[in-house]
Amino acid sequence: MSDWIGVALFIVVGIVFGAGGMLTSFLIHPRSKNKFKLETYECGLPTEGATWVRFKTQYFTYALMFVIFDVEVIYLYPWAVSFVDLGLAGLIKMFLFIFILVLGLWYAWKEGALEWK
């Protein structure tokens, strides 16, 4: 039971810090609402045209692909550090992991997810 005291303390401190930050933000936020506070701020100049702009979904697709392959690097680093200890089995597993990721990239490329339209 004493092993879980540290975990419980960590969770409680996390909740207190999160709730404390939200409470502090609520207590000190500016309360005056007027026309100028609700306008979109653009370099100190009045906005011209529509302030709500639609973004292409390709931005989301590229961001998602970046996150996927960025996470791949996170898994490659510990493998590279302990490469000698893992031996041939670790090498085969990592090649399988990279093959699955390359297969996913090939599929996305084949489906046209990486083409800018």
From Swiss-Prot:
Give its E.C. classification number.
Answer: 7.1.1.-
Q: Name one GO cellular component term.
A: plasma membrane
The organism's place on the tree of life at top rank:
Bacteria
Q: Which reaction does it catalyse?
A: a quinone + NADH + 5 H(+)(in) = a quinol + NAD(+) + 4 H(+)(out)
Protein keywords: Cell membrane, Membrane, NAD, Quinone, Translocase, Transmembrane, Transmembrane helix, Transport
Subcellular locations according to the entry: Cell membrane
Q: Does the keyword Membrane apply?
A: yes
Tell me the protein family, please: Belongs to the complex I subunit 3 family.
Q: What does this protein do?
A: NDH-1 shuttles electrons from NADH, via FMN and iron-sulfur (Fe-S) centers, to quinones in the respiratory chain. The immediate electron acceptor for the enzyme in this species is believed to be a menaquinone. Couples the redox reaction to proton translocation (for every two electrons transferred, four hydrogen ions are translocated across the cytoplasmic membrane), and thus conserves the redox energy in a proton gradient.
- Which protein, by its recorded name, is this? NADH-quinone oxidoreductase subunit A
